[in-house]
Amino acid sequence: MDPITVILSALAVAGGKVGAKAIQDGYAALRSLILRRFGRSQPKLEERIDDYVADQEPFQKPAEKALRDAGAGTDQEVIDRAVELLRQAEADKPGITGGLVGQINAKGVVVAQTIHGGVHQTIDGSGKP
């Protein structure tokens, strides 16, 4: 699964002020982490995120490009926080993620950019690849 899609979804869902204070706090923490890590190298990143959260459709491409150019999709902490935020939002308001959490939770789905070294993945629980 594309990490930028996950990050954008988390920002859109949680930034829309839907749900509990914990979700709003999670959004603020994710946004802050992204800007802290990548804001200096991408001066328009904050504006792109804020525009996207306010109105997703016209601002999706600029926000996606800014996040990709910044390298946010390769930062595992950012990805993990986005995934957790989506899970919290889905638990608070079932269906709000449009099925994205179900896709993330599905067997065999990995939200990651690059995996270095060997990978052993068991799909059926047997312990056999």
Predicted regions and their residues:
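Short amphipathic alpha-helical segments that predominantly mediate membrane engagement
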Residues: 1-8, 27-108, 112-129
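Short hydrophobic alpha-helical membrane-entry/anchor segments
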Residues: 14-29
